[in-house]
Amino acid sequence: MSENSIRLTQYSHGAGCGCKISPKVLETILHSEQAKFVDPNLLVGNETRDDAAVYDLGNGTSVISTTDFFMPIVDNPFDFGRIAATNAISDIFAMGGKPIMAIAILGWPINKLSPEIAREVTEGGRYACRQAGIALAGGHSIDAPEPIFGLAVTGIVPTERVKKNSTAQAGCKLFLTKPLGIGVLTTAEKKSLLKPEHQGLATEVMCRMNIAGASFANIEGVKAMTDVTGFGLLGHLSEMCQGAGVQARVDYDAIPKLPGVEEYIKLGAVPGGTERNFASYGHLMGEMPREVRDLLCDPQTSGGLLLAVMPEAENEVKATAAEFGIELTAIGELVPARGGRAMVEIR
């Protein structure tokens, strides 16, 4: 079977970050007395479901450690590897850091798919690592029933510049760096619903590196940052609000969307992860139409950065985004928490 004829998505039951275990189930898995081990140098651990772990070395520098892997979200092996690696490296940028090294995680059904196809996947990962300026320094592989690829990535960050998802403040404006709808478009493609003019759009967005994160972290008025991935905008924004004790107002019409996404939602191109996300976070939302909910809960793979920015830093953030060619979009604001109001209010 050639690399050009292969359809990797046929070999997996899930796709991309839509493979994630639901937040509710994950809470059960991680709940343990042993998880309460306290190391004063561990600045970021499990407590706030942040993008990566951060460890203070005590010399003004902290180490960032993260891992991310999933099953194919696209059919092309090289693109699958590139997307998976870009997605994993993004966690370092979302914490405000600089990646320094990565190792690969590969699960491969060796009785179904050739090693040459696995090599193409790995080459895609290596390409993304080169884009980020790091080496793919090694890894680990197993014989698995479904193809899996990802990275474990190490980064560094000045300790004072660590950006958490839990340090937002009321008064911050919310900005997104990529459009939503990746899960919808990739599902539409799997269902053979995707129009010719929309082919490749999701892949292009997923391959965009969130490299601007380190520069955003240098701006004092950027109070919190996270990347929008498997739990959707609603999930990651809810975690930001819960960690900071604030609430959010979001302008639905302002949210950047991939072309055709609302049409595909009406046609039923909604990934399974959407329902899992709503089951975990839906109680935090106000009333809204089903199609709005399906977009806000859409699992993103290698999605954009979500920034909480104080108004006085808005111009500097926009200028930084322009330097990286990012179409930055304001989607709402954070407000003081008040009883009787939804944590995430959609207008």
From Swiss-Prot:
InterPro entries: PurM-like_C_dom, PurM-like_C_sf, PurM-like_N, PurM-like_N_sf, SelD_I, SPS/SelD. One of its GO terms (cellular component) is cytoplasm. The record marks K20 as: Important for catalytic activity. Its cofactor is Mg(2+). GO terms for molecular function: ATP binding; magnesium ion binding; selenide, water dikinase activity. Coiled coil: none annotated. Mg(2+) binds at D51, D91, D227. ATP binds at K20, T48, R49, D50, D68, D91, G139, H140, S141. The active site is at C17. Binds 1 Mg(2+) ion per monomer. It catalyses: hydrogenselenide + ATP + H2O = selenophosphate + AMP + phosphate + 2 H(+). Its EC number is 2.7.9.3. The keyword Magnesium applies. GO terms for biological process: selenocysteine biosynthetic process. Keywords: ATP-binding, Kinase, Magnesium, Metal-binding, Nucleotide-binding, Selenium, Transferase. Signal peptide: none annotated. It comes from the Bacteria. Homodimer. Synthesizes selenophosphate from selenide and ATP. Belongs to the selenophosphate synthase 1 family. Class I subfamily. This is Selenide, water dikinase. It comes from Escherichia coli O6:H1 (strain CFT073 / ATCC 700928 / UPEC). The gene is selD.
